[in-house]
């Protein structure tokens, strides 16, 4: 692998693996609101919000950090009042009790309008803020922090829109298309000092899990597994330790805890699921630091690779992708070679492909746990040279083609499913 490609991959990882506080979809909306307020130069009196279906779906039922509230209005209000766009996905980290009170007052004034925007990218956020005769407009598209358009009082300040900005574009980095072999080679052969930074994912996400265990968040999936019934019927093993640590961080995050996590490809839950099963297993088997670094890099880069063709948001639950990365890493830590790691990927795809995304919410911790369970099973089977074959379902002999089949189903094949899920969610009486 030449130096240019290595540098491109490192840059890609630094761009995709970043800290985030709160579910990334409502936080991205808060980021756009913060930028619109900054450009406006004053507190907005009216805010119009236009969102793609996937952003709307993922922001409806999830807790907003530090508020005890759920949904978009409070996220938009706080972004406009106390948000700082320079913080990116940590836009609300300066929240105070005074700021929260002011945000609640803005929500009560009903000056925030939220509407669905049709025929746009799956990740599309448009904010129009106004006060008096002043008006600002901000658009985020393709990526959670990618501000492509800024306007104030009719003057265009930034315009990165392209001819297909309102269409589907799932991979912004056209100069670097990853493959399984490229991911494996990079993770296994890079000098440790050049990839040691990936340990930051373990440090930050483990802190989130530890903080979660001190409280009661969401459906307390982690405490259920570690509780009396969990210990009695599931035991105490490397497997249950993985479930406990991973679901703990997700429990807290989905419930709106003011706890930062390291995200992957715009998703905190993907960052959690790519990190904590690997870290937990590594701690249980007492592997070396080098093994942990390479395992984490393999997991995170595999997630990035799959998301290149799947897209930021889809009808497919992101835990399928993230758990696939984790399964690769677990197989490696078990002593698996490249062939067995490819078996783990095929086993994952042959098992939980098709799990729908019905928005970000506390029960995501249960889906993450399902992904972790399948990751362990897939790794165990791979180590026994058991693999879903190319005569079965969507699996191809070529592992990259199998991944392409998975992402085609998630990005194209489930579009009608995505629309139906949103219709069901928005049509409920609750």
From Swiss-Prot:
Q: Which InterPro entries match?
A: Ser_deHydtase-like_asu, UPF0597
**Which organism is this entry from?**
Parabacteroides distasonis (strain ATCC 8503 / DSM 20701 / CIP 104284 / JCM 5825 / NCTC 11152)
Instruction: Give the protein name, as stated in the record.
Output: UPF0597 protein BDI_1130
Q: Which residues form the signal peptide?
A: none
Q: Which family does it belong to?
A: Belongs to the UPF0597 family.
PANTHER family the record matches: UPF0597 PROTEIN YHAM (PTHR30501:SF2)
A single GO BP annotation from the record?
L-cysteine catabolic process to pyruvate
GO molecular-function terms, A-Z? L-cysteine desulfhydrase activity
The domain of life is Bacteria
Lineage of the source organism? Bacteria, Pseudomonadati, Bacteroidota, Bacteroidia, Bacteroidales
